[in-house]
Amino acid sequence: DPNSSPGELIEALKDADAAVPWLASIPLDVAKHLPKLKLVQLLTAGYDSVDVIGLSKLGIKVANNGGSNAISVSEHTVSLMLSVYRRMMEAWSNTKDGAWRSGVDQLPVRTEINGKTVGIIGFGNIGRQVSRRLSGFDCEVIYHDVVELMPGRDGELGAKAVDLDHLLRVSDIVTIHVPLNSSTRGMMGAREFNLMKNTAIFINTCRGPVHNEADLIKALQNDVIAGAGLDVLEEEPTDPDNPLLHMPTSIVTPHWAGGTGEGNERAVVFALSNLERVAENRTLLSVVDPASIFKLRDTRSLWLIP
């Protein structure tokens, strides 16, 4: 229960070898009273809801969902690309309001995704699934990630590694798939939006704070970029007066890209497999490396979602 007090959590988990928080966290002031706890198993790809480094100092490992929601998030990502390009929200509003196509023909020409250059920032489980889904659209896919793929994997996945600034300058669509930590918070800001084409669109289905929302709003208002498709925002739920909800060039969904029945089932199955590994004292899967976070947390380096 996310509303449980620290005392209630300690009582509930005092004999647990593993915990699977849902819509809640395991605070350090609770974890330090749980000497048997070995694993905090997350059902999400992101791990910003827990203090990985602090838990590791207590001998507790943190594992994410092992890419269980990668297909769900990648499908939602591509749907946002298409929706922004084809002005779906405006078309729906016109149709629903009985205007049909009246006024729609005066909108900027809708755009095909076919043949466009798509830049993927963060080429982990989700980024790679996005690349696979774009292959059917004959897109040129480029990516940036600090973790190099094994030789030959670029061609296998139909993507080419480039530096970040080049990706921003040449991409028609920029989509970001990184974990939220101190190195990625605000990594898409005014400088980055100004590097993008004024015809380019920005997609974010990972974590809201990786983009600077005020800078994104200004970029859209001033036609620095052409559009945005967002499943995440800096504050959730957002203020109903948030300009991003009222711009014809932006589409916002309520942080549910990964929330499909299939994705949820895979996440639960993966979590159960790791719980079995704890019970059998076997090697755990998809454990977040605290040493890497500690080493790289003050750089722009730890981008790959395991």
Regions flagged by a language model, labelled:
Residues 43-44, 60-71, 164-165, 206, ...:
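Short beta->alpha connector loops at strand-helix junctions that form conserved
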